[in-house]
Amino acid sequence: MKTTYDPTAKFDLKVTEVEYRRAVSGRMLMARVYQPQGGGPFPVLLDLHGGAWNNQDRTANTMMDEALAKSGILVVAIDLTRAPEAPYPASIQDVNYGVRWLKQRARDWNGDPTTIGALGSSSGGHEIEMCAMRPEDPYYCVHKLAEAPDLDATLNYVATRSPVSDPYARYLNAEKLGRAEMVQNSKNYFNPWDTIHDGNPQEILDRGEKVTLVPLLVMQGELDDNVRPAVQEKFVASYRAAGGECQYELFAGCEHLWVREPGPQTDRAHETVKQFIARQLKAKRLAGDQQSARGEDPRRIATDPLDHES
């Protein structure tokens, strides 16, 4: 049966949890599975929490995860290694493994792994941008998936909310504002300190590195003084200039964490992500139909991004 997605649909949910791997500290990294109850198969979304690389877990984005899953998306939110346990690139290694793990497990929850995309919030947005841009980087692919060793971490699309697209600019802003905890969070994660430049999506584009550019959604609060709009808009412009497709949505009157509270702008964020995903899945179906018409195997795109490398 073909996977379809109607962003206006309504489904009941079954929510379960499963361990997906262990952090170097020994902490169980859990995955929370939001499984629509219905015919399926359903498109698949991996969700990555924020927390300045030092805090939070898979429950941080519950309101968004539930809203998306109730529209007919298999949403799986995962814990990530925190900086006090291990610095960069440990959490991005989790993400890379998590993408491959979810591709391998999606059918267990009535999901279609060929549709996989990801959602990242704040530092989770940074981590998924890094993983999506460098899906096959040996630095990030260190955790082997014995059950499916040939799977890779490529994605069809990425949606973000307040992503830390330039962690060095965010650090300088925190230093200027006297936010000692935020400054220390950056130092905890980027250790040694020069890794803040290697693991920096904006600087990667500035250096002209050869990276994968999947369709990207960036949602940004107008009043965000944590990740400033001007910094985000520079990244969006750089992503487009490098050949990537990027939808940028500014949310008037909103700060960094606006989606945590119910309201019209939170509802708008939910709908923006749904419509973005619907467009990407439609594009994927069209690409598959064109491959079939040419006599090619449309299943090949199971691990290929919708966009090409740039």
PLM features per residue range, with description:
Residues T212, V218-Q220, D224:
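Short beta-strand/loop motif that positions the catalytic acidic residue
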Residues D225-K234:
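Conserved alpha/beta-hydrolase "acid-adjacent" motif
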Residues R100-N173:
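Primarily recognizes the serine-hydrolase "nucleophile elbow" in alpha/beta-hydrolase
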Residues T59-A77:
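Short amphipathic alpha-helix adjacent to the substrate-entry channel of hydrolases
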Residues M1-G39:
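N-terminal cap/lid segment of alpha/beta-hydrolase-fold proteins
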